[in-house]
Structures are given as structure tokens and as C-alpha cells.
Amino acid sequence: MGGQEVSVEWKKLGEIATDWYRGAGIKRDEVSEEGIPCIRYGEIHTTYNIWFDECISHTDESKQPSKKYANNGDILFAITSEDIPFIGNSVAYIGKNKIMVGGDIVVMKHNQDPKYLSYALSTTDAVLQKGKGKVKSKVVHTNVPSLKEIVIPIPSLEEQERITTILDKFYALTTDITTGLPAEIEARRKQYEYYRDQLLTFKQKA
């Protein structure tokens, strides 16, 4: 799997992104069960992983003075974390309707396969890049200039879709907590991480 002969370009996110912007607002006490679907940065750390199509939170759109939205295919980054390994955690939004995006989230628009980008941004190498130069403190921050420097492999859209299809199957096994003991689920998670890194390891950087 790793080292496969596939045409690939290694590109910075700054080269593939078509737009960047930050979310705004949506305090904890402004989250409700009704209203427009929304996402807060903490949910990227605790609730969503790789991709999601529905929000667990909503808010009253009319009460948000500064409105920022995400649409189908956007990549969302949490730019604040308490731990360096989790700084810049990202998730792809693949739902049909626009959602409101809270503060400490950066939205990246692009023309690639959103699931592929999210898998590529979760690899061991990408996580190390996100944390590069960060110093442990009570709260760790990153920003758009730093995110733009992250380098990931970009094969053809057809190859991106092929890789995503394989990883979706492995990833589904790690999230199905209804089957298997905790030890089995942990083994599946390690297997998924292994194949993810292998599939996203190409022979050489261009």
C-alpha cells in the first residue's frame, strides 16, 4: 500500500485552498436544540472525527451579530486546544445545508475530495506538522498562516475517491461500538491508523 506508484503532488494547504476565514461567536449558553445547525470548536475535539453531515448543536441565528457559515465540502479546523497533538484538529462537513461556525474555528474551501483531505490531515505526519513550533502552555493556538504551510499528498480526484472508499470501511469498524469488546475496538482503531498512514504514504515527495 505504502510506496504505491501513483502520480501525486505534495502541496501546501495554501496552494489548494480557494478561501480561508474564521468562524465567530456561538457561546456555550447560546447553543440550543432548535434553530440553525451550528458547530463550536470544542465539538471538533470531542464529537466529530474525519467527517460529519449533521450537527448536534443549534443556535438562534438572529441573535448572532457576526454570522459565519460552512457549506458542503468545507474543512473545519479547531485552532485552539489544551494539548499540542490536538491543535489544528480538522473535520470535513459533508451535509447538504449550510451551518453556522463558531469562534476558534477556521474554514477552508477547496476543490478536492473533502473526505480525502480530512483523512490526509489526520495522518501521523500531518499531526506533527500542525504541532511544529508550538509550545505547551495552558492553551495552544494556531492560525491560518501556519495551516497554509501544512504539506499533504494530492493525487488525482479519482485516486482520492478510491483511498477514501477504503478508509471509510476501516473507519466504520472503529466507530461501531455495538460490536466487539473494548480491546477488539482498540485493535481495529490501530489497524485503521496503520492502513490510513500506509495508503497516504506515497513513494517520494515531488
Regions found by a protein language model. Give the residues of each.
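Non-catalytic DNA-recognition/assembly elements of restriction-modification systems
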Residues: 2-23, 184, 190, 195
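A short glycine-rich beta-alpha junction/loop motif
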Residues: 98-104, 135-156
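A short beta-sheet element
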Residues: 40, 65-124
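Sequence-specific dsDNA recognition surfaces
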Residues: 14-27, 43-72
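Short, conserved secondary-structure segments in the cores of folded domains
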Residues: 4, 27-28, 66, 96
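Short, structured motif recognition centered on aromatic/hydrophobic residues
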Residues: 8-13, 36, 70, 74-76, ...
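Short amphipathic alpha-helical linker/capping segments at the junctions of internal repeats
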Residues: 95-99, 171, 181-197
